[in-house]
């Protein structure tokens, strides 16, 4: 029998498996990772920033030809809120400089996971909205 995140003692409902909790604490200790609480709002912000950063790379690689294509997929395929207009429209509302600033701060703690998209750098430098970005404009 394998070990999972939870145990179901006596078939009564799940409880956190203390062995897994101990394993997590031990691995964090050896990796010198300080465990911290992260709010739901912070998790949501990090996920959106990661999605925006990756979507910008998708534009830069020519996989998508426009921010509108990404908006369409984000709303119809991923369930992104329609009233936000799609992921890239929402990113334009947040503002590219704001997004670049937030990702740059996160990159200070993990530069591999938070490598800033060249498209975002370009848009910030030129004052271009993501919705106005075209692949042949990049000059980084």
Provide a role label for each language-model segment.
Residues 1-140:
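N-terminal glycine-rich phosphate-binding loop for ADP-containing cofactors
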């Amino acid at each position: 029998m394998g070990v999972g995140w939870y145990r179901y003692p006596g078939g009564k409902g799940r409880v956190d498996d203390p062995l897994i909790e101990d394993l997590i604490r031990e691995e964090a200790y050896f990796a010198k990772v300080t465990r911290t609480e992260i709010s739901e709002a912070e998790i949501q912000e990090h996920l959106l920033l990661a999605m925006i950063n990756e979507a910008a790379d998708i534009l830069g690689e020519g996989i998508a030809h426009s921010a509108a294509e990404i908006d369409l997929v984000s709303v119809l395929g991923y369930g992104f809120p329609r009233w936000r207009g799609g992921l890239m429209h929402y990113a334009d509302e947040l503002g590219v400089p704001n997004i670049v600033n937030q990702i740059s701060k996160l990159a200070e703690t993990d530069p591999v996971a938070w490598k800033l998209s060249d498209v975002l750098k370009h848009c910030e430098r030129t004052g271009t909205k993501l919705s106005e970005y075209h692949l042949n404009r990049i000059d980084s």
